[in-house]
């Protein structure tokens, strides 16, 4: 493959992030149609919609963890992303409290970056293969903490209900019955998926990543490089476009 990338970046990683961003925009567009405009789409809340949603968040979180060691100033970047998550929470609480976002994906990613930056020295001492395996196992074990237990399948360790108390416990993954958020990604289990991506980078290594410098679709790369800003802007833009489109469709045609 001939590389047209001269920036020194791993272009394919940007493009994968951009592709995932497009998928997320389409998913959120469907969310608007179903929840705000009343369009009937049973598949959206069925298995197809769930798998679509999970594919988006898995790629985002794994890729974010993978790319941590490619950049610098992890703590500063984490603070920026966490602040963006706080902004999303504030805006939704103010303007659309019934569809509020509390502890959404940006809050998770910012928290994961901050924790990774603080724990960078001990994390780097862990062999990448062992770190990846441990992270994957812990992700599987904590996948259902929101449902009240550790484990999977028939192997379940039920947790005390006193853990599920308030917003602080919800941040960690133990949300009480009254907690509500349209986008919820707690530290447990998702921090371990982030760290799985972090250790996956160590397994792959920079030498084997050279083919990732080759660009396949530059427009997707541009989206990937500006993913945080586009994430913050995409929902109001999509809502406005859908609203104008539906108004135009519903207008009676003039003779």
Show which residues each predicted segment covers.
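Alpha-helical transmembrane segments and their immediate juxtamembrane cytosolic regions
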Residues: 1-250
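Short "domain-exit" segments at the C-terminal end of structured domains
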Residues: 251-255
């Amino acid at each position: 493959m001939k590389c047209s990338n001269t920036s020194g970046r791993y272009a394919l990683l940007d493009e994968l992030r951009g592709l995932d961003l497009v998928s997320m925009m389409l998913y959120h567009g469907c969310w608007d149609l179903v929840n705000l405009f009343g369009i009937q789409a049973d598949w959206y809340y069925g298995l197809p919609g769930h798998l679509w949603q999970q594919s988006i968040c898995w790629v985002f979180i794994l890729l974010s963890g993978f790319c941590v060691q490619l950049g610098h100033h992890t703590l500063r970047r984490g603070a920026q992303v966490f602040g963006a998550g706080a902004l999303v929470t504030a805006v939704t609480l103010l303007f659309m409290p019934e569809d509020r976002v509390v502890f959404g994906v940006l809050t998770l990613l910012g928290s994961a970056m901050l924790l990774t930056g603080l724990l960078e020295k001990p994390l780097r001492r862990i062999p990448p293969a062992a770190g990846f395996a441990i992270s994957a196992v812990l992700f599987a074990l904590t996948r259902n903490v929101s449902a009240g237990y550790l484990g999977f399948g028939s192997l379940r360790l039920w947790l005390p209900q006193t853990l599920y108390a308030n917003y602080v416990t919800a941040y960690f993954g133990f949300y009480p019955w009254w907690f509500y958020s349209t986008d919820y990604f707690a530290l447990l289990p998702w921090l371990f998926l982030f760290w799985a991506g972090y250790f996956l980078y160590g397994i792959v290594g920079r030498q084997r990543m050279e083919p990732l410098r080759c660009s396949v679709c530059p427009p997707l790369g541009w989206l990937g490089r500006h993913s945080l800003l586009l994430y913050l802007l995409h929902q109001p833009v999509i809502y406005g476009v859908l609203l104008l489109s539906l108004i135009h469709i519903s207008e009676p045609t003039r003779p």
